[in-house]
């Protein structure tokens, strides 16, 4: 019996799943961030070691990493996996979005909106992507972009902020004092990650019709829809019917995000018949499918 291990290594957390040939779950583990670009090396290795603690000896391993952006980072990812498990096995490293796409094989396009954002799909047997440039150069419609709007609204208009937003900020930062909040963002190992934790507040406030939140949802979902439209025009121009799988924490935070996204997407590409659903299986299962390909010689 072979043991297949998949890892979903993101900017907020890392998860490990081991399964056998029959699809039985043998192990699940979780720890902190494991982004190959933004997570410090020592912390990344400790987090993966903690997430994999107790995992049975693997035969085939695939780690899907945020921050895997070059052949060099791929090789680094493979080396980290080899060190983490410390046993003879077959290893591969792929970008984190590949796991989400493989977890939803029935979808034409996967739109990921978590801490960051990215659009990916299959085209002529290859996986193609748009976006994914990080919170400084992109991440349209990401948890970071909404969380930043939420915190900025509070800092600029604390007296007009809802009780829900105030509670969420205090839960994340432990204070409502401006100096503590600003310091907390800039001293965070990943500013994007800590700000993304405020996305639920934006969804809640948008549902209540609070202006800053409704404007934030409309603006960022318009940008994300425009990114998807560019992806479709370039990679799926002849398609008049497309299915989209929505992955990431933003879609779980509130129905407001999906509703606004669909409105703007239809405005961008009115000729396309859209079918849209939340990712039905966690990306971890896609990572396991990628590990299985190692056994099939793909």
Predicted region positions:
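Conserved phosphate-binding catalytic cores of ATP/NTP-utilizing and phosphoryl-transfer enzymes
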Residues: 1, 88-111, 125-126, 236
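ATP-binding/phosphotransfer module of carbohydrate and carboxylate kinases, centering on a glycine-rich
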Residues: 1-57, 103-109, 151-298
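Short, glycine/acidic-enriched loop or turn micro-motifs at the edges of active sites
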Residues: 11, 99, 117
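Short beta-strand-loop/turn "lid" adjacent to the catalytic site in phosphate-handling enzymes
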Residues: 36, 53-92, 243
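Glycine-rich beta-strand-to-loop/alpha-helix junction loops that act as flexible
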Residues: 62-69, 113-116, 242-252
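Short, conserved acidic/polar surface loops in the N-terminal third of protein domains
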Residues: 72-76, 102-106, 121-124, 257
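Glycine/charged-rich beta-loop-alpha catalytic/anionic-binding loops adjacent to active sites
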Residues: 82-86, 92, 127-134, 266-275
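Glycine-rich phosphate-binding loop of actin/hexokinase-like ATP-binding domains
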Residues: 106-157
């Amino acid at each position: 019996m072979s043991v297949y291990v998949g890892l979903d290594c993101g900017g907020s957390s890392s998860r490990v799943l081991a399964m056998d040939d029959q699809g039985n779950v043998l192990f699940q583990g979780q720890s902190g961030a494991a982004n190959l670009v933004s997570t410090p090396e020592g912390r990344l290795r400790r987090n993966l070691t903690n997430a994999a603690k107790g995992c049975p000896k693997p035969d085939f391993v695939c780690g899907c990493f945020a921050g895997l952006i070059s052949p060099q980072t791929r090789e680094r990812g493979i080396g980290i996996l080899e060190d983490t498990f410390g046993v003879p096995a077959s290893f591969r490293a792929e970008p984190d979005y590949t796991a989400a796409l493989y977890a939803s094989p029935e979808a034409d396009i996967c739109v990921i909106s978590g801490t960051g954002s990215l659009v990916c799909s299959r085209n002529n047997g290859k996986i193609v992507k748009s976006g994914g440039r990080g919170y400084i150069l992109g991440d349209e419609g990401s948890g970071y972009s909404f969380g930043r709007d939420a915190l900025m609204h509070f800092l600029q208009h604390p007296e007009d902020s809802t009780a829900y937003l105030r509670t969420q900020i205090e839960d994340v930062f432990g204070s409502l004092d401006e100096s503590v909040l600003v310091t907390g963002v800039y001293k965070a190992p990943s500013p994007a990650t800590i700000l993304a934790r405020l996305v639920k507040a934006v969804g809640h406030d948008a549902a209540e019709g609070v202006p800053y939140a409704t404007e934030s949802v409309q603006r960022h979902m318009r940008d994300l829809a425009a990114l998807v439209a560019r992806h479709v025009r370039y990679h799926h121009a002849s398609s008049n019917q497309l299915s989209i799988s929505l992955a990431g924490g933003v879609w779980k935070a509130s129905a407001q995000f999906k509703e606004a996204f669909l409105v703007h997407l239809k405005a961008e590409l009115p000729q396309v018949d859209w079918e849209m659903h939340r990712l039905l299986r966690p990306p971890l299962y896609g990572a396991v499918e990628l590990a299985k390909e190692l056994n099939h010689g793909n």
